[in-house]
Design a protein with these regions (language model features):
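Extreme N-terminal, non-catalytic leader segments
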Residues: 1-8
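Hydrophobic anchor at the beta1->P-loop junction of P-loop NTPases
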Residues: 11
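The conserved Walker
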Residues: 15
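Conserved lysine of the Walker
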Residues: 19
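ATP-dependent NMP and nucleoside kinases share a basic, alpha-helical "lid"
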Residues: 48, 54, 71-130, 136
Length: 175
């Protein structure tokens, strides 16, 4: 096994920006290099660990707190933990970083435009939001605040998945 520099790679961006896709592809790449990896996908965490939470500001904060606490525990047993969650504002991302620790936390901002995310709509969520079936949907009814500080910025509408993974691997300074 290669020497690891344990990191939590925290993807933030709008729904449809490519967080889950990149998390899964990054995991495959890292596992091929014999690293241990865990993925925390926002949709999966919301369906299980955070199924009691709604989308109020208070519940969004608690959701991110729980995800960050879990990532903090998992990084003790893994080389990499990959988190794919919208985390819609700087306050929540700062909370996650504080819980996980500055030495472990790497923020990857997927800056893909709202128009691109809406045209992709892989889960049909924008369609539901426009139909009024989802209230306070981030990017439409609820605000997404672009990060003021990040380790890497990627627009997945401008570069390929492969190029995105290469940029992340370079940021992590691994092969």
């Amino acid at each position: 096994m290669k020497k690891s520099k344990k990191k939590v790679i925290w993807f933030t961006g709008l729904s449809g920006s490519g967080k889950t896709t990149l998390a899964n592809q990054l995991s495959i790449h890292l596992k091929k290099s014999k690293y241990t990896v865990n993925i925390l996908d926002g949709d999966e965490v919301r369906a299980g660990l955070c199924s009691d939470l709604k989308f109020s500001d208070k519940d969004r904060k608690e959701n991110i707190r729980r995800v960050a606490e879990l990532a903090s525990l998992l990084i003790k047993q893994s080389d990499y933990v990959i988190v794919a969650t919208i985390s819609p504002n700087n306050q929540l991302r700062s909370l996650a970083k504080k819980i996980i620790g500055n030495d472990f936390f790497k923020l990857v901002y997927l800056s893909t435009s709202l128009d691109s995310c809406q045209s992709r709509d892989p889960k049909g969520l924008y369609k539901k939001a426009f139909a009024g079936e989802i209230k306070n949907f981030t990017g439409l009814g609820a605000t997404f605040e672009s990060p003021t500080s990040f380790d890497l910025k990627i627009d997945t509408s401008e570069i390929s998945i492969k190029q995105s993974i290469e940029k992340i691997i370079s940021m992590l300074n691994i092969k």
